[in-house]
Amino acid sequence: MTDFKVGDHIVDFENIYQIYAVKTQKDLKGAPVKCFFYRPLEASERDKSVVASVPIDNVAKSGLRHLISKDGVKEFFKLLGKPLDTALLFEPKLTKEALYLNDPIKTVPILKLLFQNKIQTAEKFAKTNSEVMERIVKHLSDEIAFVTKKSFKSIHSQILSTLKKSST
């Protein structure tokens, strides 16, 4: 997972970033450590100076990954369009843990379970679950829109309409 280079776009469970430098720094013991530096792609004026770095050897632990591929987008929508596996159970405590894995494909069952739970519970759908679901859809919409060069709004609508079709 060390195949990151300057100019690459990367993502964590919240934002899309761009790597702008690779430098060697010293760790706390004075040993040289190769790090890459990145900043949010869409930083506000206040946050334009915000930068982050991560040792290249720790990228796997950082939660950062390359953006989903175009083939990954196709697989995502294909899985999203399939009916929900009836053996899956909605487990709210595991939802956030699974999201921190930052894997769009592994997010599909969680998203489908949240959506199904929303349909089944109607007005009683927990506000926290609603917020989590919207956060997932927003994050995926941002990433997929960036990769496919489509609008956020069209991807957001496509995700929601696919969820509706697969749950009927």
What are these regions (language model features)?
Residues M1-D3, K26-D27:
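Short, surface-exposed secondary-structure edge patches
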Residues D3-F4, V11:
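Short, well-ordered loop/turn sites that connect or cap secondary structure elements
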Residues G7-H9, C35:
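Short, acidic/polar N-cap/turn motifs at the starts of alpha helices
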Residues D8, A21, P40-E42:
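Generic alpha-helical secondary structure signal
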Residues E14-N15, K34:
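Short glycine-/polar-rich loops that comprise or flank the Walker A/P-loop
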Residues N15-Q25:
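Short beta-strand-centered aromatic/proline hotspots
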Residues D27-D57:
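Short solvent-exposed strand/turn elements
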Residues D57-T168:
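Charge/polar-rich, low-complexity and marginally structured segments
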